[in-house]
Amino acid sequence: VIGGDECNINEHRFLVALYTSRTLFCGGTLINQEWVLTAAHCNMEDIQIKLGMHSKKVPNEDEQKRVPKEKFFCLSSKKLYLWDKDIMLIRLDSPVKNSAHIAPLSLPSSPPSVGSVCRTMGWGRISSTKETYPDVPHCVNINLLEYEMCRAPYPEFELPATSRTLCAGILEGGKDTCVGDSGGPLICNGQFQGIASWGDHPCAQPHKPAAYTKVFDHLDWIENIIAGNTDASCPP
């Protein structure tokens, strides 16, 4: 996270860290005792999930480790672009109980509105020019923008005219998610609305906001998978 501050230790009980070997490479969000929602591009062979973590170096007493029991992707018949359906549900190998630093974040009850102030967080890079990673998660407030603001700066991607992605950032630059924040939550007006998906490099440039998978559009799929209907289809 660029341009943010260390998160309050009590404000991110739902935030999980995805590790492969000993490297923290993505974030995710605990949505109930057994399920984590993250980005599809965070899929790796040997994922370890740390819950209830704040500092990488000083563990919380209630920190927990899990591994995926099952992973589900939102597959569509369309060609799978990086920015399309960047969502993955992970079922944990055993449930976690709520504790001082662990509690799920509920799914959104209404769609987000452009102009909302949103909070995002993660252990990703805190410098857009240097590979500086923090020991603690950083949090930042950014604005929910019109989707076109994410489409216009990237003509080379030939992005579709409408999309199940949200666009969020600060037009003057300086605040953004960055490498290592993928899969983490975007929380707008207290509701879990987005999953960090992609952005430009270097991060936090003016007029180069980032894209977040729109959780609200995938609610039916999420609820179906959790209910055991594993051949649930994705929104078109």
Swiss-Prot record:
Active-site residues annotated for this sequence: H41, D86, S182
Cross-referenced InterPro entries: Peptidase_S1_PA, Peptidase_S1_PA_chymotrypsin, Peptidase_S1A, Trypsin_dom, TRYPSIN_HIS, TRYPSIN_SER
PROSITE patterns in the cross-refs: TRYPSIN_DOM, TRYPSIN_HIS, TRYPSIN_SER
Tissue expression pattern: Expressed by the venom gland.
Keywords: Disulfide bond, Hemostasis impairing toxin, Hydrolase, Protease, Secreted, Serine protease, Toxin
Disulfide bonds: C7-C139, C26-C42, C74-C234, C118-C188, C150-C167, C178-C203
Assigned EC number: 3.4.21.-
Cell compartments where the protein resides: Secreted
An example molecular function term from Gene Ontology annotations: toxin activity
UniProt signal peptide: none
Domain of life: Eukaryota
Record PANTHER family: KALLIKREIN-1, KALLIKREIN-RELATED
Family: Belongs to the peptidase S1 family. Snake venom subfamily.
Subunit structure: Monomer.
Purpose of the protein: Snake venom serine protease that may act in the hemostasis system of the prey.
Protein's name in the database: Snake venom serine protease pallase
Species of provenance: Gloydius halys
